[in-house]
Structure formats: C-alpha cells, structure tokens
UniProtKB/Swiss-Prot annotation:
Signal peptide feature range: none
Protein name in UniProt: Sugar fermentation stimulation protein homolog
Family that this chain belongs to: Belongs to the SfsA family.
Pfam families for the chain: SfsA (PF03749), SfsA_N (PF17746)
Alphabetized GO MF terms: DNA binding
InterPro entries: SfsA (IPR005224), SfsA_C (IPR040452), SfsA_N (IPR041465)
Length: 237
C-alpha cells in the first residue's frame, strides 16, 4: 500500500475526544486532524512526538487531515489508522503473501454471520469450503520487549468475534483470527492479559475449539505500508 500523495509530517500537541488531534507543522501552523482510532492508543503516541497524516481534497470534509502514523514513546512507528489493516490484509491475501490462506477462489468482505449479529472481515472460498477471517490491528508495544500485545483497551466486541469464530470451528468450518501488526520493531504478538483478561481467555478458548490464529508484521514509513512477514503468537501468560 502506497500513500499517494506521500504523508505530511507534524508534531503532536494533544489527542482529545477520541477522534481529534491537534498538531503543529514545521511552519508553526497548528491544525486539527481526524484520529481514526477508537482504542486507547496506549504506548503508541506521545505529546511532542512526530506524526504523519494524509490530506483529503474533498471540500465536504470538515477536517481534511487524517492521522496515519505515530512515533511511539519507544521510538517505533505505529500505523494508528485502524481502517488500514483490512486493506493491507486484502492486498496481502491477493498477492499470496499470507501463505496459510493462499489459493482461494473468491473473496468477500464484511459478510454477515453467526448468532450475535457479527460481520466477518473476509470470507474466502477454497473449492467450495469457506474460511472466515477476522482481522485485528495491533499497535500496542512496551519498552524493552519486541512482543506486541492486543487489545490496548477492553474489547467486548473482540471477545464476541472470538466466540463467533469458535462456534464456526466447532461446526467444522475453517475460522481464522488474523493480527495485523502495524508497529515496527516487533518479533511476536500476545494477548494483553493485563488489559483485558476476558479477551485473553476467549482467545485461548477459541484456539482450543479449533480457531487458527495468525499474526503478520508490516514494514511501514511515510511512503507506504506492506505486510512482509509471519510472526509467532504467544498464547500463554
């Protein structure tokens, strides 16, 4: 995925009301940009740190800027636009980069399924046998470790998705939880037990029921982002 045009750079002044951030450009101009992330963004931003944003020319938009990448307190780069994860995964699926899911004959997005009113991110067809793939964007890192964690805030919705996947797996349907790690300097992923114990337990229960868990890392900068490697998932606390 290439950013076109390339991202613009600024300095973070503050994030507030979840969806807003004030930044300062190199010229000294201050502007408010949209923050497309509903999570806590724990450890993936710092006031005074560098941010990169895209700019829309749509005159109907109240805020033309969208926050895309953040410098973390650990000096890493994090793609904070959670909407990028699904596009990155689709790109990687179609390119065959995610080898465990290569060879599908059809791909559908946002398909309704399950008993709790869920929508799966991707339904893939493999010679008549479907695979359901749920995508989560990972940006939480900690100092002195190359292991990222998910989630960065309590997520009942995430636990619901795991329950739905587990039900599919128990019925013999292929079900996959895929973590897209949009954070540099990461070698592995784990559930954030210290933040959401229920989610971590739901993940381990889903695996016991037959849900496949995959994690892929990205290479990212102000020019673009690409999924480039498989990462291990550490399930035990």
């Amino acid at each position: 995925m290439r950013f076109s045009p390339s991202l613009e750079q600024g300095r973070l002044l503050r994030r507030y009301k979840r969806f807003l951030a004030d930044i300062e450009l190199a010229s000294g101009e201050q502007m408010t940009i949209h923050c497309p992330n509903t999570g806590s963004m724990l450890n993936c931003m710092r006031e005074g740190g560098q941010v990169w944003f895209s700019r829309s020319n749509d005159p109907k938009r109240k805020l033309p800027g969208t926050w895309e990448i953040s410098e973390t307190p650990q000096g890493r780069l994090a793609c904070v636009n959670t909407g990028r994860a699904n596009a990155l995964v689709e790109e990687a699926l179609r390119a065959g980069t995610i080898t465990e899911l290569a060879g599908f004959t059809a791909l559908k997005r946002e398909v309704a399924y399950g008993e709790e009113g869920s929508r799966i991110d991707f339904r893939l067809e493999f010679e008549g046998a479907p695979a359901y793939v749920e995508v989560k964007s990972v940006t939480l890192g900690y100092p002195d470790t190359a292991v990222a964690a998910f989630p960065d805030a309590v997520t009942q919705r995430g636990a619901k998705h795991l329950r739905e996947l587990a039900k599919l797996a128990r019925q013999g349907v292929r079900a996959v939880q895929l973590y897209c790690v949009n954070l540099t300097g990461i070698d592995a992923v784990r559930p954030a037990e210290e933040i959401d114990t229920a989610y971590a337990q739901a993940l381990r229960a889903a695996v016991a029921d037959g849900v496949e868990v995959l994690a892929y890392g990205t290479r990212l900068d102000a020019e673009g982002i690409v999924i480039d490697r498989r990462l291990p998932v550490l399930l035990t606390p």
